[in-house]
Amino acid sequence: MLKPLGDRVLIEVSEEEEKTVGGIVLASTAQEKPQTGKVVAVGPGRTLDNGELATVPVNVGDTVLFEKYAGSEVKYDGQDYMIFSAKDLVAIVE
């Protein structure tokens, strides 16, 4: 399994619907980029200037909302993931 470093978070991105409510199939270029996903791994946090560790504010299993164009795509063991810095996470979905 991948273990993020620093304040990074590994997310399994939610799949978006390929059809509209009316049943029209959308081309992949017309689909909105997903902005939610499930946290699968969390780094230890970021070391502050005073030496203290600022932990990441999410936990494994959380569903999060993230910035639309942030993060890096990663493929590991046949699965697609994205890695984000904690600052690119917008909210926890409850």
Swiss-Prot record:
A single GO BP term for this record reads: chaperone cofactor-dependent protein refolding
One Gene Ontology CC term in the entry: cytoplasm
Instruction: Name where it's found.
Output: Cytoplasm
Keywords in alphabetical order, please: Chaperone, Cytoplasm
Question: Which Pfam family, giving just one, matches this sequence?
Answer: Cpn10
InterPro entries recorded for this chain? Chaperonin_GroES, Chaperonin_GroES_sf, Chaprnonin_Cpn10_CS, GroES-like_sf
Q: Show the GO MF annotations.
A: ATP binding; metal ion binding; protein folding chaperone; protein-folding chaperone binding; unfolded protein binding
Q: Which family does it belong to?
A: Belongs to the GroES chaperonin family.
Q: What does this protein do?
A: Together with the chaperonin GroEL, plays an essential role in assisting protein folding. The GroEL-GroES system forms a nano-cage that allows encapsulation of the non-native substrate proteins and provides a physical environment optimized to promote and accelerate protein folding. GroES binds to the apical surface of the GroEL ring, thereby capping the opening of the GroEL channel.
Q: Describe the subunit structure.
A: Heptamer of 7 subunits arranged in a ring. Interacts with the chaperonin GroEL.
Protein name (database record): Co-chaperonin GroES
Its source organism is Tetragenococcus halophilus (Pediococcus halophilus)
Taxonomic lineage:
Bacteria, Bacillati, Bacillota, Bacilli, Lactobacillales
What gene, per UniProt, encodes this protein?
groES
